[in-house]
Swiss-Prot record:
Role description: Troponin T is the tropomyosin-binding subunit of troponin, the thin filament regulatory complex which confers calcium-sensitivity to striated muscle actomyosin ATPase activity.
Taxonomic placement: Eukaryota, Metazoa, Chordata, Craniata, Vertebrata
Gene that encodes the chain: TNNT3
Species assigned in the record: Gallus gallus
Keyword Cell inner membrane: no
Designated name of the protein: Troponin T, fast skeletal muscle isoforms
Keyword Phosphoprotein: yes
Pfam short name (any one): Troponin
InterPro entries for the chain: TNNT, Troponin, Troponin_sf
Keyword terms, alphabetized: Acetylation, Muscle protein, Phosphoprotein
């Protein structure tokens, strides 16, 4: 219920109370005297003349004063309600301001923490970069010293070692050439697989074809590996036979000669 409705309700109650008081007063004034008791017929007595009792005049009820007091009371209550409302509103505004201040303070603290964290990360990255540069410099210096030592060692060695290095470089070049040739041949054999235009059946056929081809390659690889094993075994066997034959021939030659002559 609003404050205005409370005031109107209070005025209505006040008017009803005043109206009831007036009705009670009128009833007291106009109340008729009780009828006289009927005397018995046998004995007739003289009738007494009855008059309405007079109401003593006392203090008159001032309804205007009552209404003013009631209105003043209602105004005081309304003013108290208004004051309490504004007091609650003031407290809410103070709490809102305090909340905003706490939020701003927390935001500033978080920004400060992020700034400190960023500075520490920057210092860490700079320290890592310095350590990396120092290690690279030390590695380069050590490598230069090793190269200088190698050059001095090579210069102190004779031309035989230089020719040996030249031959080693030549062999390395041959190996590199053979490796490049192998890569080239494999690149020519290994053609790109174009299957974008194939449907499901053709893809299934293509997969089966590739599987068969892979199975054949694995079979050939296994056969070649077995052939290499057999060849190695045969070579080792032949070498052992040659070594045994050479040993026997040396022993037989030593026994056949006596004093540099044959027996």
């Amino acid at each position: 219920m609003s404050d205005t409705e409370e005031v109107e309700h209070g005025e209505e109650e006040y008017e009803e109370e005043a109206h009831e008081a007036e009705e009670v007063h009128e009833e007291e004034v106009h109340e008729p005297a009780p009828p006289p008791e009927e005397a018995p017929e046998e004995e007739e007595k003289p009738r007494i003349k009855l008059t309405a009792p007079k109401i003593p005049e006392g203090e008159k009820v001032d309804f205007d004063d009552i209404q003013k007091k009631r209105q003043n009371k209602d105004l005081i209550e309304l003013q108290a309600l208004i004051d309490s409302h504004f007091e609650a509103r003031r407290k809410e505004e103070e709490e809102l301001v305090a909340l905003k201040e706490r939020i701003e303070k927390r935001r500033a603290e978080r920004a400060e923490q992020q700034r400190i964290r960023a500075e520490k990360e920057k210092e860490r990255q700079a320290r890592l970069a310095e350590e990396k540069a120092r290690r690279e410099e030390e590695d380069a210096k050590r490598k230069a010293e090793d190269d200088l030592k190698k050059k001095k060692a090579l210069s102190s060695m004779g031309a035989s070692y230089s020719s040996y290095l030249a031959k080693a470089d030549q062999k390395r070049g041959k190996k590199q050439t053979a490796r490049e040739t192998k890569k080239k041949v494999l690149a020519e054999r290994r053609k790109p697989l174009n299957i974008d235009h194939l449907n499901e059946d053709k893809l299934r056929d293509k997969a089966k074809e590739l599987w068969d081809w892979l199975y054949q390659l694995q079979t050939e690889k296994y056969d070649f590996a077995e052939q290499i094993k057999r060849k190695k075994y045969e070579i080792v066997t032949l070498r052992n036979r040659i070594d045994q034959a050479q040993k026997h021939s040396k022993k037989a030659g030593a026994k056949g000669k006596v004093g540099g002559r044959w027996k």
